[in-house]
Amino acid sequence: MAKRDYYEVLGVSRDVDGKEVKKAYRRLAMKYHPDRNPGDASAEEMFKEATEAYDVLSDDQKRAAYDQFGHAGVDGNAGAGGFGGGASFSDIFGDVFGDIFGGGGGGRTRANRGSDLRYTLDLDLEEAVRGTTVKIRVPSQVECKSCSGSGAEKGTQPETCGTCNGAGQVRMQQGFFSIQQTCPRCRGAGKIVRNPCRSCHGSGYVEEQKTLSVKVPAGVDTGDRIRLSGEGEPGVNGGPPGDLYVQVAVREHKIFTRDGRNLYCEVPISFVDAALGGELEVPTLDGRVKLKIPEETQTGRLFRLRGKGVTPVRGGAPGDLLCRVVVETPVNLTKKQKDLLREFQTSMEESGGQQAPKKHSWFEGVKSFFDDMKF
């Protein structure tokens, strides 16, 4: 079943601010919370749907990705712009209702998947069309060797949090609500570090640069993403790592522009070739090909070279190369050349406009326009 629009789910317009998004979610969460609707599967689904919508629309980066790409931009707890790790229902609900039940919904309360990361990969058009393999260097959080990931100074150990007894969560009861909240003392870690490691400052991780090999499939275009599973941030409390999303950005080409599977280029020709016709070589990504120019060709005419475009990344027939002719006006003429052109112009005028029909038609239209004007 297709997902509903997140703005529709919360009953808000697309231009509302974060406060209105939060207000709409509070209203729906109070109405459909499972503790208020025991055994009602429909209410539970409505609650989950509202929570999912709030998770995206309350985050500026996720919301921007959703506005641009729809559900595809935020599926898998990742968006085209933010790529934050996914939050659990209890985290989100605690964030919204923490002021009611005491304590905010800060850190993660259980084993959570690590955050996704994004890397922008600049490619030449030829690389994007043919495919390539590139090496990239990205920052990575790795386990601190000094403390073996405990976050505590060597020779010491973290203590079990006495507030939550190591669970990382405390249960709050208010009326018909019974909600697990992140422990305010240990922030969900379940442990307290009395003597933080000086290398990682108590986090258990240090940042290093790592080199990854990225296989770029043929046919990718700007905006396409390549997913490297498990290469994101490390998980929290034993959770799995996130993913690294490599986003493609194709550099501007000096000859070709791309539109989907088709390529476009401009081909300058002399006015003699335009008038008399001829044959010239034009570039393609596979080499040079002959292009026949018929006589009386005008600027702007498109010539299609079938199959000389791009094969889509998901397969299918290759596109075409469309060459747009631009008739070039000669410059730096000699006196003799100018005299010949004046002689040619005189002969053109004697033809009564038959050899320049567009020009003749335009001037006739202008003359008629002024004749019809009343002064």
Curated annotation (Swiss-Prot):
Homodimer. The keyword Zinc-finger applies. This is Chaperone protein DnaJ. It holds the Pfam family DnaJ_CXXCXGXG. A zinc finger (CR-type) spans 131-209. Its cofactor is Zn(2+). Binds 2 Zn(2+) ions per monomer. Residues 5-70 form the J domain. Keywords: Chaperone, Cytoplasm, DNA replication, Metal-binding, Repeat, Stress response, Zinc, Zinc-finger. Belongs to the DnaJ family. One of its GO terms (molecular function) is zinc ion binding. One of its GO terms (biological process) is response to heat.
